[in-house]
């Protein structure tokens, strides 16, 4: 869990904002939402496969745009 040391004469709002930012970077909220309900192993595999397909298509689109710019 992210920890934030409050500096001397630092307003509470600033420390809270730093804490929220560190939680966001660590992915705490997304992890909590993901673990909120049980997900079947088949659903996990299906989600990961869909993410892999999405990454692959995104990579292909990037390469296609790069190729089109050259000519």
UniProtKB/Swiss-Prot annotation:
Keyword terms of this UniProt record = Ribonucleoprotein, Ribosomal protein
What does the entry give for GO biological process? translation
- What is an example of a GO molecular function annotated in this UniProt entry? structural constituent of ribosome
For this record, the Gene Ontology CC terms, alphabetical, are:
ribonucleoprotein complex; ribosome
Gene3D superfamilies xref list: Ribosomal protein S8
Q: Which domain of life is it from?
A: Bacteria
Q: Does the keyword Ribonucleoprotein apply?
A: yes
* HAMAP family, A to Z: Ribosomal_bS21
Q: Which family does it belong to?
A: Belongs to the bacterial ribosomal protein bS21 family.
Q: What is this protein called?
A: Small ribosomal subunit protein bS21
Protein species of origin: Marinobacter nauticus (strain ATCC 700491 / DSM 11845 / VT8) (Marinobacter aquaeolei)
Gene of this entry: rpsU
């Amino acid at each position: 869990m992210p920890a934030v040391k409050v500096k001397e004469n630092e307003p509470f709002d600033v420390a809270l904002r730093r804490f929220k930012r560190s939680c966001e970077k660590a992915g705490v909220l997304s992890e909590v939402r993901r673990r909120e309900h049980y997900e079947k192993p088949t659903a996990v595999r299906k989600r990961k496969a869909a993410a892999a397909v999405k990454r692959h298509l995104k990579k292909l689109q990037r390469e296609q745009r790069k190729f089109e710019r050259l000519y």
